[in-house]
Amino acid sequence: MNIILSDVSRYKGSKGTWKDVFKYYVTNPSFRVIFLYRLYHQWYHILSKIPIGKDIFSLYYKHICRQSGIQLSLDAEIGEGFKFEHFGGIVIGSIKIGKNCNIFHNVTLGYAGRWQNGGGSPTIGDNVVIGAGAVVVGRITIGDSAFIGANAYVYQDIPENAVVGAMPGKILSYHGTKGYFGH
């Protein structure tokens, strides 16, 4: 359950408590989604033993996702310290996301290509920021501390510390998120 505290700490901007978890769950639609995602993964073994347990949870989760405008696949693998900066228009498929990732609104992260032709989903590194309106698709890797700018369309690997601008996604520098997370 410490992973939930690491998420709420990102929302709060300092060390989070269970009181903060309650506060953000009640007041922040985007935190509500990541909180329920975490609960599902913590309680999966319990939910799967209860007849219709997973079904009831899944219905509630989908309801909360619709309310917030965030479609987050329960099959995604997300590291600790995750934060939706804003909510609305966010689609995250079955992808891998590292620690301390920030995602802004209207972002799409997911599968591209055809199954038979080697399509796939992205892997996002640690300390990555993905700006508003960005699209990151395909079997690609976004390196640690990369910054994907607003409205960028990314379909190829991005090295660590790269800053990617809008269409087409071009590397603008190699300073990434340096200073963004206080390091």
Where are these regions (language model features)?
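Short, basic/aromatic-enriched C-terminal tail that caps enzymatic domains
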Residues: 167-183
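Terminal amphipathic alpha-helical/low-complexity segments used for targeting or macromolecular assembly
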Residues: 1-68, 178-183
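Left-handed beta-helix
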Residues: 68, 74, 79-80, 85-86, ...
